[in-house]
Amino acid sequence: MRKLLFVILLICFHTSLYAQTNNVLLSRVLRQVQLYPQEKTYVFTDAESYQAGQRIHLRVFLVNAVVHQVDSISRYVYVELLNPERLVVKRVRLLRSDQGFVGHIDIPEGVVKGRYVLRSYTKNMLNLSRYESLKSIFIGGHGRLTPSKYSNSLNREETNNSINLLVNVLKKGIKVSIDKLSNSSEDDYRLFVHCRSIPLYFGKISKEKDVILSYDSLSQGGIYSFQLLDTKLNKVAERLKFVYPEKELCPISVRWTDGEKLNNNQIPCVIKADSLREGETMDVSVRVEYAGVDNTVGQSDIISHLLFDMDKADCPEEPSSVCLESEPDSLLDNCNWSRYRMSDVIKGECKKGLIGVEKSAMIRGRVETLIGHKPIKDGVVNLISPDKSFYVVTKTDAQGRFSFEGIDFPEGTQYVLNAFTKAGKSWVKLLLDEDEYPSYKGQLPPFVWTSNDTTRVDATLKLPKGGIQMEEVNVFSHQPTYSSRSDAYSRTADFSFGLRDIESIGATCLHELLRRVPSVTVEFGKCYVRGGFTVGGRRPAAIAIDGIFVNEDYDLDNIQMADVERVDVFKGGSTVIWGAIGGMGVISVTTKKGDFKAASVPLTNTKTFTTLGYQIPQAYTPNARTPMWLPSLRGASFRLLFPAEYRSTYRLIIEGVTSEGRIVHYTGEIGR
């Protein structure tokens, strides 16, 4: 927001309106932006084309939609791989880290060749249905995007056809005039000009009086919205123009220092931006790719995506050529800028997004009675993650609802939920809210398939002299779990039998094993812990199989010892992690994976599930097509080392933003 406040202060000196009205307008715009901050995403990948079974390495730039600074508010970004039928092939969830949002998507084996798209979004971005962020990739070949005027009639705003708003872009400014037809009775109009909601002009305009905006007074670049308003500030007409993108760019230079060639045949390369302001730094991603595979013509880039695609409704992706040619004017005809309804904002009608910003992961659900399905108030809900040594408890509200916040665990983490009444009874029904992800229903960017490609892209780099190319070898290993204290349950247990203990004892049944535990007795097939008495008499210990409680009359002989990996006994204070049902002690049996069918023990108060956790970044493996991939570089300049052979056949691509929101983009063959 630093850049936004700075720009607004500058605009105060260039807005041709009385100071009092000007201050009101600026305060309303600023209030809307603060009340409903919007975001944009851009996906930078390690290549433009892939093969089935290959891994897509990516970084998502999440920026403020107004000033393009990376200090955005969402904690998570979702990335989906969509096939040509708009169906989700893979979905990952990225957590903000020191490197930004860095992750990968594995392309399944056997997928058909064609154009696929990477869709990226935050929960906050779902408030805008007509603004999507797509990145085209090609599997099994190469292709290029073609410019398109996407057609979508949703939410089109009607304007007065009796007034023509004419916008003429000049070298040193912009001339705005109106052509009013004879049947129009209105004579008093206002012209409102903004770029990404940043107001640039607000003043009177008439058929006899044109408005001239000088180049130096315009601080922004990208899509400008020229709105003609009547005396009640209702929008009469609107025109969009793509102008002065150079105002948003931060040019960089790449210089080779041949005189510093190192002994290992590597040459230093210095990347810097001479136009950086005081305190301004770059946050960029870098890749080096083989120049003979993908032609950069017909590909999108960060400039066209942030300045054009994400500011035009129903425009998911255009090639980078839209920023360089005369195409934007035809593509913007009859379009409206609708990230904010600016005609309402200048009236003081500011709105907030319906979907809140996702700042932490949450698990939600509901607890109700088995009969009548009535909500249970003050019910106890336990959340346990055996894999991550995690345990937390909460209570339900008057509607039987519960929620756990701050559940930040990686993908694949398994959870167990147990619900009970306030009195500790398990005769309840536990309902878990399923995660919902929006389907993509918009248009796919048009493209032209240029060539097929079956070349192995996971081949190694150029072999050194005397090297031997080996076939791919996969090595798998399995280490048996002999530890008796390997997860959250066993570490707090009073007594444990691990796999090694069970094998050394040679027990033939669980009863034989439990008789070795002090203060535990086995009578008539039930286990009792000494001291386990209630006002209703003596009660047996609870039995949990793989974290799920079974009925009190469950026969432990149903479990074969060959299927058991560990047995843990909880007595006294250690039973607190199991909730009220574990008050008489708990016998926890962990089976070998896949050998025990827990589904044969249906429990309405227990759920075992896995959520879409965040993805852990993986190291990049260089290949012949992309020998270098650096997802995150921050600073005012960078010094990289490249092998000398890169200078003849490889291309360097750098994209990112600066701390002040200026866009960084560089593409060029190394050494030229």
Language model: regions and residue ranges:
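Short, solvent-exposed loop/turn motifs
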Residues: 55, 87-88, 199, 235, ...
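Ligand-binding face of N-terminal immunoglobulin V-set domains in extracellular IgSF glycoproteins
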Residues: 101-107
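Bacterial Sec-dependent N-terminal signal peptides
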Residues: 1-27
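Periplasmic plug
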Residues: 526-571, 597-602
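Short, solvent-exposed loop/turn positions at domain surfaces
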Residues: 44, 390, 553-555
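Contiguous segments within soluble domain cores/interaction surfaces
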Residues: 20-39, 44, 50-51, 55-94, ...
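Glycine-centered small-residue motifs that form tight turns
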Residues: 584-587
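Surface-exposed, low-complexity/disordered segments
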Residues: 32-36, 47-51, 72, 108-113, ...
